[in-house]
Every structure is written in C-alpha cells, then in structure tokens.
C-alpha cells in the first residue's frame, strides 16, 4: 500500500509542478498530451483506491454535485472598490492628492497592474490549503463559490514553498481569455445554447453555475492582485513584494505588473498597455495604479468604499453611432431633472444600448443636440452610456429642438435651477410622485434601513395607490393592505410587515443615510453620527459646527443644516420615531474624558485571540477611547499580539513599539 501512496504523491506533485509552470510561470515543460496522460494515470489509481484521494489532488477540480443555491460568505476584510479616472489630468490630480496627504516629501513609487475585465474573487488558504472562495458581492458579503473555484486549473488547491501563513486570503480576478470565449459561443451557436455578449459575462456566468461540472468545462483563468486576511505569517511591506511572494507560492500573477518611479512613468505604462491591448488575448478596461509602500497606504487610508492610495485609470470607452429618437425627462430622489436620450438600439462594447444620459440642460446646449440627430454613443467607464457628440455633417432635415421643461413632467410643480448649479430640480418635494418613489426606494435599501423584500415594484404600487406618502407610512402598513398589491399573497405580505418591524431597530448612521439628505452618503452619515452622537445634537448644529466633522465642507454642511431646518423634514423624523424606529444610545469615545490605558492610543491587533473574537476586542478598545488600525506604522502606539502573530509583530519590534499579549489586554480591559 505504501508504494501506491508514494506513486500517488509523486503523480500529484508532478502535475502540480507542471500546472505551476503553465499557469504561473507561462513556461510549460511538457506537451498537453503528456499532462493529460499523467492526469489519466492519477485518476485511474484514485478510482482503484478512493480512500487515498486528497482534497488538494488535481483530480478534484472536475466539480462536485450541483448546488440548490449559493450560500453566503462574509468577508472578514471588506472587498473595496476603486475610484476611477479617465484622463491624464484626472490621474495627475490624484497623484497630487496622494503627495499632499503624505506631507512629508516621502518618495512615492507606484505598482501598476492590468485592470482585468472579469469577476473579483477572494480565496482563503488555511495552512496552505484552499478552504473557501467567494465573490465580491456587495463588498461585505459574497457568494460561496468554493466548488467552482476548485475547478479552475490556474488556482492552486495547495500552496507550495516555505513560510506560508496559517491563514491567507488571496484576492484577484477570474476571467476568460478571448479564445475560450469564442469557443464557448461557437459551441453555443452549434447546440442552440446561450450566446454571451462578452468575455466578462461569460466568466461571471461560468463562475456562478450551481453545477460545478459546468464550470469545470469552461477555460477560466485567474490573476492575483492583493491580499485580504493575513494571520500567522509574514508578507513583504510593499505591494509588489507581496505579489512576487504569492507567485513563489504558486499563485498566478500577471507578468505585466510594473513598478513606476514617477507619474510620468505611470503614464508611459498606461499608454504602452493601451497600445498592446489588442494583442493580450484577454479583455482589460484600464490599468490599476497603487502606492507600493504598505506604510504609505496606511497613512493615506480610505474614503467611503475605496482606498485613497489606489485608482483605476480607465481606457477610453468603446463608441458607436446611432440616432436620437426622443428625449425624455426623469425625476430623481432629490428632484433633479435628468434628460435621457431614447436611441435607435445599438451594440456598444457588447451591450445593447437604447438609452443614454444627457446629464442636464447645459450638456444638451454644449452638444447642440436636436431630436432626430445622429450621435456618437460611448459607454463611459464601460458602464453608463452617454452621448459624446452630434454628427452635424449628417444631421437630418426633420430634427426638432429639445425643450427643457419649466414644470415637473410628473407632478407639474415648478422646475427651478439655483444659480451656479448645473442641475434643475422639481420643487414639489414629496408631493411629487417620482421623488416620493425614489426617496422611499432609497429609505428601504440595503445600506439604509435594509427592509428585506421591499422591492422597487412594491414601492411603485404603494405610491401609485397612495398607500404611502412619507417613510413613516411604511411602518403603518398591514398585511391586509399589502395583499391588495399585484403578486402579493398573504404569506409574502406578512413577511414584508415582519421585515418592516425588524428594520425599526437600526443605527444612527444608517438612519441618517436613509433620510436621503443631499450629498450625504454612507461615509458622511457615519462621520456625522460619530461626531454628534445624538439626533438632537445634530439637529441643533450650526453650519460652522457641521464643518468640524472630517470631510464635511461648506456645501454638505449647508445641505444638512437646511434639511433639519425644514419643518416637513422634522415632522417626518418625529413620525418615524413615533412608529418605533430606534437605535442604541451613543458610546462616548472622547479620549480626553476616558480613564483608560487605551484612551487616545492607536492600537493594532495581530494573531488569533482565544478568549474573545477580534471584532469584540476591537469594539471594547474603541469604547475605551482607542483607535484600532489595520497595520503597524510609526504612528502605532501599541500592538496586541495573539497566537501565531506574524509580520505586524516583527515590524512593531523593529520600530520599538510597545507589545502586549492577550492576557495583558484582558487585564487592562478589566481595569
């Protein structure tokens, strides 16, 4: 039996070695036929000795039984998105912001990568073995695609090499090469199956198959671009260093990753990649530019849901020509009137486009647009279609002027445009059915009050039937009233009522965001909630006081102040509170007023804790006035080291930062 085990081990080692050479090093040593022969030999041996099959065997990529549905995986470290720039001027402005924020004349080097047009995934390895994989999802929670990811040959089931961390989350992009995409569509046309519009859709559809056996037949591949969870091990202190280390462990990394010493070198890299784009063999839509130093990344931090130390420099979007058949005007949540061009449908970058935004009246005037014109359409950022210009040389004789409305197309209220602003707005407020619908949709959305099951179509019907006028009216709904809506049976109606009841318990930050105050997104709402602590304090705040909140300037402060000065808004808030909407009392975290050994200190947690979860530890430290950071820098005051602490502990010792263990932390928390 020992000889069989040895034979299996040698075959698996040989196959993994050749997968590494093929997918990571791009330097295969053997023909595909020889690889296939070795795989057949391994599969035959494992069939005869199923008790010796291991989870990391190359044969285990073929796919398991179909799933009924995907389960959810919560990301321990959120998967953030990136801000975009679309021209050199915007990139240079980003470069200047980075330099200005560092304020210490430190040299910034940039790690530049291809922006792959695929699907972002996170892959967790424990002791070097792949244990789970998830999609990005909403950034905090993704779908469990472990079975499907295991079928992708480019992704190692087991890392090889030395000093592999106990827990390592590899992040990257799963994508479909152009040749594989064409083959899939060729097969689909021959068999009458689904034809995909572009490789990204094909990759996403392949990766989100409930049957992993289907995924296994798709030639998906993968490139790593970063790290999430890191426990029980060390990594280099530069982004490029980390990517090179991943490559040594067997994780595929693009060979186009380049270190640039200046903004000029970054621009040269961008233009070179743009030139090479047609010959790459897979789709990209730009380059990603990251500050290479991890210490500088820590100093720069994050804003909302994106890092300040990275940006995606997008390529010019693909363009097509078509005709404008009409221009209609939509009314948004804040009353903004947006002209929308109705187009003769045309395919742009693999997507059928029939509408395009015209932004505002100034944009229509700038374009000189008339109804009936031939126009150039671009998918800005490869996402939102917009009209780039009018083809004046081919203007038909029967074009018509675009007349911007003076009254709301929905409620008839006056349309006003404040001097200095580009946007015209309906003055109807919640009297306007369109504003009411959009405001309510925002109020119940996942990141606001998070009312499960309350979809857009339900909101539309509630407003049209005049069941609901303000957000507070939602909490007065009964199952009986809801059953009067289309496709709303008693069970679903009761589920919605239960969800509304559950949503009454929220947080101050979510509540503020749900109110839909102009210019107040999630990050600003969280900042206001943390600074003022109570609704009463925020309502009473002056414009000057509001500007003391980080990232709140005069414009946002004015919008917040004006919102709470409006009697109708205060009445809606009072009604919501009367209906039972509530949140926990604020936790005082003024370090100057807290008698705690952690007050005012920047603390970093590393390693695993045995007596409490990391989240609980963070919460207790924040309550006691600490700022909990994610990495060690010169600004760190204290490092708490649990079991298997790695690079953070080493860096703390190198910098002479105070280090305590979990037992000492618990003692201090108790004091």
Curated annotation (Swiss-Prot):
Pinpoint the BRCT domain residues: 593-671
List residues binding NAD(+).
Answer: 32-36, 81-82, 113, 136, 173, 290, 314
List the CDD domains. BRCT_DNA_ligase_like (cd17748), LIGANc (cd00114)
Cofactor(s) for this protein? Answer: Mg(2+); Mn(2+)
Query: Could you tell me the keywords of this UniProt record?
Result: DNA damage, DNA repair, DNA replication, Ligase, Magnesium, Manganese, Metal-binding, NAD, Zinc
Q: Which Pfam families match?
A: BRCT, DNA_ligase_aden, DNA_ligase_OB, DNA_ligase_ZBD, HHH_2, HHH_5, Nlig-Ia
InterPro entries referenced in this protein's UniProt entry, alphabetically: BRCT_dom, BRCT_dom_sf, DisA/LigA_HHH, DNA_ligase, DNA_ligase_AS, DNA_ligase_CS, DNAligase_adenylation, DNAligase_N
| SS bond list | none
PANTHER family from the UniProt entry: CHROMOSOME TRANSMISSION FIDELITY FACTOR 18 (PTHR23389), DNA LIGASE (PTHR23389:SF9)
HAMAP family according to UniProt? DNA_ligase_A
Q: What is this protein for, i.e. what is its function?
A: DNA ligase that catalyzes the formation of phosphodiester linkages between 5'-phosphoryl and 3'-hydroxyl groups in double-stranded DNA using NAD as a coenzyme and as the energy source for the reaction. It is essential for DNA replication and repair of damaged DNA.
Q: What is this protein called in UniProt?
A: DNA ligase
User: What organism does the UniProt record list as the source?
Assistant: Shigella flexneri
Q: What is the lineage of its organism?
A: Bacteria, Pseudomonadati, Pseudomonadota, Gammaproteobacteria, Enterobacterales
